[in-house]
Amino acid sequence: MKDDPFARVIAAEAGAAIEEMKLTLIHNFEAMMVCCRAGVPIPIDDRVRYRYDSAVVADRCLALSSKMLKAAGSGGVRSDSDLLSFHLDILASQAHVANNSTPFASNLGGVLLGEENLDFAV
């Protein structure tokens, strides 16, 4: 795979996306800690965005691993494939309610469009 230009592009996309997601989560956590240390509530709009940012990670990782599987060809879908094993783990992670991004995306979209927050768990 390392000589395949398509695989190289996917590797670059995956690496950059993973770093972006990681930095977003770290930034969000640091922003929450600033509020906590100052003894002020974390603004609801920020909490709604943080919730979406964390839930969408599984979706983005699944899309990236799907591209990687496609680039791997038939070797990627064999039962002993490490890539397939990771892909299935990511897929399984979406079974947890915290990783189902659709309701969090809908809530964030509504908030961004001026609606009230509907997620009272944030």
Question: Each predicted region: which residue ranges?
Answer:
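Glycine-rich phosphate/cofactor-binding loops in nucleotide/flavin-utilizing enzymes
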Residues: 74-122
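Charged, glycine-rich active-site and insertion segments that engage polyanionic ligands
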Residues: 45-76, 83
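Extended amphipathic alpha-helical segments enriched in small hydrophobics
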Residues: 1-34
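Amphipathic alpha-helical coiled-coil segments and their boundaries
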Residues: 7, 14, 43-46, 50
